[in-house]
Amino acid sequence: MKKLSILLLTGTLLCLSGGCDSYRNRDTRIAISYLCVGQDDMFELYDITATYSDGKGRVHTSPVTSFPWKVEYSYMPLGVHAQLEINFQPKPHIVRKESYTVGCNAYINWDCLQGGGENYSETDCYKISAEEVDAFLNDMDRKIAEGKYKLKNPSITNKSGFVQD
């Protein structure tokens, strides 16, 4: 069975409201989007779920019924590695039972806790709205679909994990 390629977009992980200092010891929100490209009949062959850890020992699992699939505004603590996996389990009627997991690490690198970074300064961090995050994700999805971005490395340790051609 051909493996599906997973593009994980960690995007720019952003504080959505409040000053950065107030989030130092609190959960904050991130937006994650990833796009799956593969067999057209994948949803007839597999039960697909996404599993991710919130960094505090809690594991969340949700079904994936279409792509691109987004986990938006999921609560995660600051400065942790978030383990994300997409699991493909063959449906019962499939004779050739083959399952696999695609996993990626998304390093939560919060500019706002480090006095600014390449995209957002500390003073800008709290000004970014949920609408802007949605616009960012939609723009990235469009660029991926147009082939303007490609996966840099399956282990995502930078801001987006994508490099522009």
Task: Please annotate each region the language model reported.
Residues 36-59:
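Calcium-regulated, polybasic anionic-phospholipid
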Residues 55-110:
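Mature extracytoplasmic domains of secretory-pathway proteins
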Residues 81-99, 114-136:
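An anionic, turn-rich surface loop/hairpin at beta-sheet edges
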Residues 1-20:
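Sec-dependent bacterial lipoprotein signal peptides
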Residues 14-39:
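Bacterial Sec-dependent N-terminal signal peptides
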Residues 117-165:
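C-terminal partner/receptor-binding element of secreted or periplasmic proteins
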Residues 23-25, 70-79, 149-164:
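Extracellular and analogous surface-interaction loops
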